Amino acid sequence: DRLSYNEYLSFETVGCTKQDILQLMTTIDRRFMAGLAYFLGARELGMGVARVGNGIPELQWDTISRIHSTCGMVVPSFIMKLIEFAEKNGIDYTNSSLKKCICIGEALRTPDFHLNTLGKKIQEKWSSLKLFSTYASTEMQSSFTECEYFCGGHLQPELIIVEFLDDDNNPAKEGEAGEVTITTLGVEGMPLLRFKTGDICYHFDEPCKCGRNTTRLSSVLGRKGQMIKYKGTT
């Protein structure tokens, strides 16, 4: 119930309604908990769901053509694969039924809310497609999702408590970098108390133009103690 409610709120945040048809371009198998959450949340909202799975651009476009999917749940770099396939095969993708994508797994924006290089490439090709960025982790069992104003992912305060801590474990000020630290609410199997995610972000507390008053999160600036692996050596 908690997982489905989390994604129900996320779909509402991006403006989905029961008139939308979600195309899941990600697996719900192989222990990918979020995939099941997307499906359950969409059904709770009343959306139709096409469970296509990841990869296979030809199958994705066939499904969009047949079912008229309006929203995609997708890794943003795969959108470029969809565009490349469409261009090679004469598909008029800019006039397809797909109007928005909720992007997972990869950064889409810079910390100041502008599209990053990948986001710009997608928008240059497909300007009518709305791209919504998200931030989530398995540990928090919740997500931060952008609204239509694209100025940070909104906290879902009934599901987690979030803090942003500096190197001395003091609260980071609004607009300053801080480590995302979360306390889960309503989790029974493995509840977490002030769990440090290792992700460094900015946060913003002023009310959003969408009318929500919840804390908003920037894209991830980096990882605390980030390491680069080179030829098997840390």
Regions found by a protein language model. Give the residues of each.
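AMP-binding/adenylate-forming
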Residues: 2-12, 21-81
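Beta-strand-connecting loops/turns
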Residues: 19-20, 175
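Active-site glycine/GP-rich loop and adjacent strand/helix microenvironment
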Residues: 45, 52-234
